[in-house]
Amino acid sequence: MIFIPPFEQGKLLRRYKRFLADVLLDDGTEITIHCPNTGSMRNCLFPGERVWFSTSDNPKRKYAHTWEQAASDEGHIIGINTGRANALAAEAIEAGVISELTGYDRLRREVKYGSENSRIDLLLESEDKPACYIEVKSCTLLEQGQGYFPDAVTTRGQKHLRELMEMVKQGHRAVLLFVVQHTGITTVAAARHIDPEYAELLTQAHQAGVEILAYSCELSPSAAKLIKSCPVKL
């Protein structure tokens, strides 16, 4: 995924009201940017460190800039825009980067499915094999050298796991794909200390046949891509 033009840079001052952040530019100007990450952003907020943002030319937007990436106090790059995870996953699948998800003829996005009024992030289809339902999650929480998901209690995430288990029961393939948007994360685990119900459900989903995958990203202000598989601890 190439970013044209590359993201602009500033220093984080503060995040507030969940969807806003104030950034100090190199010329001393202070701007307010939109924060597209609705999570807690635990261990992703480092005031005084570098952040990168994109700029929209849509005149109807109240805030023209969108927070895209952040630097941690250890120098790692974190993908803040969770909305990019699905596109990164789709691009990697189409490029054959995710070896477990090759060999399908069609890829569809945001397809309605399940009994709980859900939409699957990605659906792979082929005439000669079962459909493959893929739920994509952005993983950015790093604590004591370990990557975790989720960074806050997620009833929505629990619902998605139930839906994936149901797809397996119906004879389909179901995959939970963690897109690791943090260059310091090398392994992913369920955040049992944050959402024990999600952690338990993830174990149940794995035992029921849901495949759990994680792929790390290469991130820069000019490009982003999935590069390699990383272990998942259940």
Curated annotation (Swiss-Prot):
Pfam families cross-referenced by the UniProt entry: SfsA (PF03749), SfsA_N (PF17746)
A GO molecular-function descriptor: DNA binding
Disulfide bonds: none
Protein family membership: Belongs to the SfsA family.
Name used for this protein in its record: Sugar fermentation stimulation protein homolog
Organism: Shewanella loihica (strain ATCC BAA-1088 / PV-4)
Name of encoding gene: sfsA
